[in-house]
Swiss-Prot record:
One CC-aspect GO term: cytoplasm
Keywords: Aminoacyl-tRNA synthetase, ATP-binding, Cytoplasm, Ligase, Nucleotide-binding, Protein biosynthesis
Pfam families named in the record: Seryl_tRNA_N (PF02403), tRNA-synt_2b (PF00587)
Binding site for L-serine: 239-241, 293, 393
Quaternary organization: Homodimer. The tRNA molecule binds across the dimer.
Catalysed conversion reaction: tRNA(Ser) + L-serine + ATP = L-seryl-tRNA(Ser) + AMP + diphosphate + H(+); tRNA(Sec) + L-serine + ATP = L-seryl-tRNA(Sec) + AMP + diphosphate + H(+)
Protein name: Serine--tRNA ligase
Gene name in the database record: serS
Major location (coarse): cytoplasm
Subcellular location: Cytoplasm
Aminoacyl-tRNA synthetase in keyword set: yes
């Protein structure tokens, strides 16, 4: 969400920012809508002043026992009140129009974000490690999992349809171990506060982080009973970014409280609209998946620094697991709706012979904070400012499981457990067919 005053003050810069995303100019349209709104507000204020003046005159007329004038003024006040009610309705409609228009526009990229139409314009920032040498043809995770008898897509399809997985035995334990390892790392070494948030949220929470209204088709909604009453409607969270960021919704924090850093290990739910035909086998693109999320709330002066810190925290997970990865700076055409700059971490999957995204770390500026009305009061100042919000995967747990399986597979189909995860597996070193 944007400040319409800032758009009025520098319409050219606003449109130039949108142009980097390949979008047409919007400032003139927004300013026109706002001018209509401001004219309605001015007219309403004039009516309210007329009503107040006439009301005073009624008292004066009655004091002079001028009943005819008092009656005339009361009729005028009644007429003005009717006009005020109509004006208030117009004001509500005008406010809704400008808010809807502003809410439909994505965030403005930072100047150092590469400009391009899509992922082809993404830039490799750096890479870490090397791909493991294997003297056999590596398998993909779903072939490994099914051969172990610990990954059951058929059973999942019978009960839930496509894009679901049943994990069993030691693979289920390994996934849990990965998530617990991540949370422990982020809380004990990096200072994140663990949160166990709701997995169902209302419209306002989804609007606050900008999943709504633009990405409604990508979400799962649920209702109480069969009523389908919007008053009883909830959204299954597509990411713990939603509840974690909304922890500061409609709050005024002190500067001393910042930064706030939250982490959560949750299930996430996505409809994957528009993903037909992509990654139909395996765990890469699921309707339900587990993820460890990182969220930071900070000041405008510190948000760019916090972005780099968040990236390093996410990277450290892969370093501890000794996995080859690279970091991409996303182009303006590939970054998310609410982001001003995004880094993607892509892990190497030998079974696919490709890098695949396992984390996305974004700095959003005050874009989400304006939608949530999340503010802080700088030290020694009376006025408040909007906080800056950041979010990142730390990491996607299911994809981390895929990466461990494919990178630690052996020629006989067994999986070596990474050293960092062995304490979470009761010391187990290998997952084999009878493991």
């Amino acid at each position: 969400m944007f400040d319409i005053k800032a758009i009025r003050d520098d319409a050219g810069a606003f449109d130039a920012g949108l142009a980097k995303r390949g979008l047409a100019p919007q400032a003139a349209r927004l300013i026109e809508i706002d001018e209509r709104r401001r004219a309605i507000i001015t007219s309403l204020q004039e009516l309210q002043q007329r009503r107040n003046d006439a009301s005073k005159q009624i008292g004066q007329a009655k004091a002079k026992k001028d009943d005819a004038l008092a009656q005339s003024l009361m009729e005028e006040v009644a007429s003005i009140k009717s006009a005020i009610q109509e004006g208030e309705e117009k004001e509500r409609a005008a406010n809704a129009e400008i808010e809807a228009a502003l809410a439909s526009i994505p965030n403005i990229p930072f100047d150092d974000v590469p400009v391009g139409p899509d992922e082809s314009a993404n830039v490799i920032r750096h890479s870490h490690g090397k791909a493991r040498e294997m003297n056999f043809a590596p398998k993909e995770h779903f072939d490994l999992g099914e051969a172990l008898g610990l990954m059951d897509f058929e059973a999942a399809a019978k009960m839930s349809g496509a894009r679901f997985t049943v994990l069993k035995g030691q693979l289920a334990r390994l996934e849990r171990a990965i998530g617990n390892f991540m949370v422990d790392l982020h809380t004990t070494e990096f200072g994140y506060e663990e949160v166990a948030p709701p997995l169902m949220v209302r419209d306002d929470a989804m609007f606050g982080t900008a999943q709504l209204p633009k990405f409604e088709d990508d979400q799962f909604a649920t209702f109480k009973g069969l009523a389908r009453d919007d008053q009883e409607k909830y959204w299954l969270i597509p990411t713990a970014e939603v509840p974690l960021t909304n922890l500061v919704r409609e709050s005024i924090l002190s500067e001393e409280e910042l930064p706030k850093r939250f982490t959560a290990y949750t299930a996430c739910f996505r409809a994957e609209a528009g993903s037909a035909g992509r990654d139909t086998r395996g765990m890469i693109r699921q309707h339900q998946f587990s993820k460890v999320e990182l969220v930071s709330i900070t000041t405008p002066e510190k948000s760019r620094e916090e972005h780099e810190r968040m990236l390093s925290c996410a990277e450290e997970v892969l370093k501890r697991l000794d996995l080859h990865y690279r970091v991409m700076t996303l182009s303006t055409g590939d970054m998310g709706f609410a982001s001003r700059k995004t880094y993607d971490i892509e892990v190497w999957l030998p079974g696919q012979n490709a890098f695949r995204e396992i984390s996305s770390c974004s700095v959003c500026g005050d874009f989400q904070a304006r939608r949530m009305n999340a503010r802080y009061r700088p030290k020694g100042e009376k006025n408040t400012r909007f906080v800056h919000t950041l979010n990142g995967s730390g990491l996607a747990v299911g994809r981390a499981l895929v990466a461990v399986m494919e990178n630690y597979q052996q020629a006989d189909g067994s999986i070596t457990v990474p050293t960092a995860l062995q304490p979470y597996m009761g010391g187990q070193e290998v997952i084999a067919v009878h493991g």
